[in-house]
A protein has these predicted regions:
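Conserved acidic, metal-coordinating active-site core of Asp-based
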Residues: 105-217, 221-229
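Active-site residues of response regulator receiver
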Residues: 12
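Short active-site oxyanion
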Residues: 39-43, 62-63, 147-148, 212-213, ...
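Mg2+-dependent phosphoryl-transfer enzymes with acidic/Ser/Thr/Gly-rich catalytic loops
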Residues: 3-8, 24-25, 188-271
Length: 271
């Protein structure tokens, strides 16, 4: 590895530094803490809403958080939302209208930092209990700007990649569409122009840090914008097969502490 030590490290969470069963290795925690102690800015850049972040604060105890695939800047330490880039109601309604026509079996949920609402036929994987009833049509409750719109094929007839291909054509210029799990038949939709990469670029600019001095890690399509923007970036070897097309390098699987290994090497470089 050549070059200089980065000034900013940005990492996805799930499937990148957090195992699919929820554990974070001590080696990974130690690597991030050491980087932070050396003056490197740390950003955890995730599709998660803030209600899923307490375990990250508890594990690492350092860093900044960009949540909702770039739609929110969140203070891990105080638990406060600092900034949001939300999806307008008209964009939500147009998105639902177009996707219903293109994918008849689709169902929807909508979330902000403090709520999660779903259609009755939308079966949540993780937020069980936040909305036990649901509504017939999500349009009934689309009355406020949203952090993220979720669209699922409950019968899993289409994969997330297949759904994304359709949605990108139907929603071009209206919203940002991505996904974070090729096996879940689930799309994640944000306001136009909102992405992990776009928000990370804003934060770096505020810190007067160039893309060349930033390193990022990610495993799925919602990470690709961040991998593309950073001067050095690593797709996870066990992530989406298209990851290496968008990153400059490949890290070992998260199960082998791939991110920690790279950070340890980066910290040996001159400042």
């Amino acid at each position: 590895m050549t070059g200089r030590r980065p000034k900013l490290i940005a990492s996805d969470l799930d499937g990148t530094v957090v195992a699919h069963y929820g554990d974070i290795s001590q080696r990974t925690i130690d690597a991030f803490r050491r980087a932070h102690a050396m003056g490197i800015e740390i950003f955890f850049v995730t599709g998660r809403p803030p209600r899923w972040m307490p375990e990250i604060k508890e594990a690492f105890g350092i860093g900044n958080a960009i949540c909702g695939n770039g739609a929110m800047l969140y203070d891990l330490h105080s638990g406060k939302v600092l900034e949001e880039w939300l999806m307008a109601v008209d964009a939500q309604l147009e998105t639902v209208k177009r996707l219903r026509a293109a994918i008849p079996q689709i169902s929807f949920a909508v979330e902000s930092h403090n709520y999660f609402h779903r259609e009755k036929k939308y079966i949540p994987r993780w937020d069980v209990g936040l909305d036990n009833v649901g509504v017939e049509l999500i349009e009934e409750i689309m009355t406020a700007p949203a952090l993220k719109l979720l669209a699922r094929c409950s019968d899993q007839e289409l994969s997330s990649d297949e759904m994304l291909e359709i949605a990108l054509k139907e929603l071009d210029g209206i919203v940002t569409v991505t996904h974070s799990n090729p096996h879940d038949s689930l799309l994640e939709i944000s306001a136009i122009g909102v992405s992990k990469g776009a928000t990370l670029a804003k934060m770096a600019a505020r810190l007067n840090i160039d893309a060349a001095d930033c390193v990022s890690f990610g495993d799925n399509p919602n990470d690709f914008s961040m991998l593309q923007w950073c001067g050095r970036s690593y797709a996870m070897a066990d992530g989406h097969p298209d990851g290496p097309k968008h990153a400059k390098s490949v890290a070992l699987p998260h199960t082998d502490d791939g991110v920690a290994i790279v950070i340890e090497e980066l910290l040996e470089l001159p400042a």
